[in-house]
Amino acid sequence: IDQVMNEGRLGVAELKCREFLKKNPTHTYAMSQLSEIANRLGHFDDAELLLEKAVQFNPDDGELRMKYALVLRKKQKFAKTMEQVNILCDKYPDNLAYQAQKASEIMQNGQHEDAISLFDDILSKNPHNFSTFTSKGHALKTLGKTDDAIESYQSAYKIRPDHGEAFFSLANLKTYSFSNPEFMNMKEQIKRVDLSLRDKAYFHFALAQGYESNKQYDEAFFHLKNGNQIKRDQSKYSIERMDNELQAQIDVCNDEFFKNLDIGGNDTKDPIFILGLPRAGSTLIEQILASHSMIDGTLELPNILSLAQSLRGGDIYGKLGNYPKSMGSLSSDQRIDMGRKFIEDTQMHRGSAPMFTDKMPNNFRHIGLIH
């Protein structure tokens, strides 16, 4: 099965896994491999279910539980992800990979100072962990500690010069100027045939930013084009699918739809949703609102996206993937439950203010669900 998967013949590998599991229904490695196939095909609900059962059969397999946690994270179930990562860290306190994942989850929850402390603890034990330096840089950047973030990103690429994310992160600061040696390194790296496409895309985007800053616009567009081509080839994004999704929202969420709804939903005034297309100024609006003492700025919360995903997959409310049409068949109790769960799950991101912001850019795709 492993060989067939490595050859990319996922259909054959899936059949072999299923045949094997019919005879060995509790074989956790086979379940893990089948979940990997589902994961590669974008069937995250199936991957989650398989790994959940596998972990139940073999709760002491740390790597299996880590795979489960990462699938939960991919599905934006961050509370459940944190639960699994905590189990891993309790069971294997000396495993730095699990500690690093915990730090990333803490950072996801907005506890950046705590995350930095954990990153520093990891680096004290393994000072050559380049990815931890990069993650620490992200946390420092979020806290506005730009100079410290730069130092952390530079530490990452000094350990591994082909670590494209570190260079991209420096470029993404928008204020950083690459030195000549840094430029030379990036240009040499993208020539390598053995460089991963992920790193190569990062280098192209970093070079594009660097050339743009130097007013060398032809070179900047060249690298933007190449970086975006790599991302396009790897992406499952479809303009047609997006058009169909948005048209379905328009068709479903009309006047009649809302008039036919009875009572339901959570009537709390706590959340303030900042809706609009990405790069339309939502950050500025969030900062203005969050400057008020009665409003917590929580940045981009994933909860609405997770809720929409659950309705697509029949995960919680059993709507079998018919979103957004399925919203019309939700009972008032189900809508109240969804609102209650949103308030409870977002509590970890809030301070003590009575209201909070949610500026997740992709929430504009779910205006009907929010309403």
Regions found by a protein language model. Give the residues of each.
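Alpha-helical solenoid repeat scaffolds of the TPR/TPR-like class and their adjacent stem/linker regions
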Residues: 1-350
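Short, intrinsically disordered, charge-balanced linker/junction segments flanking boundaries
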Residues: 64, 369-371
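Glycine-rich phosphate-binding loop used to anchor ATP phosphates in small-molecule kinases
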Residues: 337-369
